[in-house]
Amino acid sequence: MSEQGANKTVADDGTVSFKKDRLEIGLRPMTDAELNRRFSSYEAYGGGSPNPYTFGGSTVFRTGETPQRFTVFLASLSNYQYPKVYLDPSRVYITTSNGRKYYALNFEQLSTYYRRYIRGGTGGNDPGVSGNAHYLLKEREGILKATMFVDEVVFSAQELEGYLVFEPIAPDVNELTVHIPDVVVRYDYKGDPIENLNVEIHFEREVGRIYPDGSKIPNSNRRMAHDPTPGAD
């Protein structure tokens, strides 16, 4: 499996966990297929599905493929060690082997992303927005609020789980590191942070290149790119 460094383990489902005593922070890369199953009740909607994380079953006309809408990780935090722990999801970012950098998207950014799909019509709660479009937007926002990793303190003997969402990782990236900076684990008597942790978790991807015909590798040797998996040295 992967060589993740000290205090890290890799589970059978691909979750990489950082452990410090009885504090555990885990990341699991999610495939579009897994996310579609998670919201399978919306699968029949295709590209109009309220599932906010994928394009569902819709395909691109010219290639017949379903593009990746976002790169998604299931993040978990289990705190049985400290009085309270704080992980700021907006500060999580990805660096890649070829120099790219991706910051986690917050709810407001994702809501803005989906508002651009609302076009014309009348009705709904906003002027010029159709009732159906407004309903779809609110469904997506509701799912995001219920399933994204929440920006809040995790007290002793509590656990927190939710999705971290990024723009799609470029197809030429074969190695990436997820950085979780400044996880606060101790506070002074005034409530100010006095001790924090910086967590880095590494993944590898099997990737190809985008060719003029739209394939990810030449048609003579076609191989689809995979979502991130724990990297192996």
Predicted regions and their residues:
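Conserved functional micro-motifs across diverse proteins
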Residues: 1-233
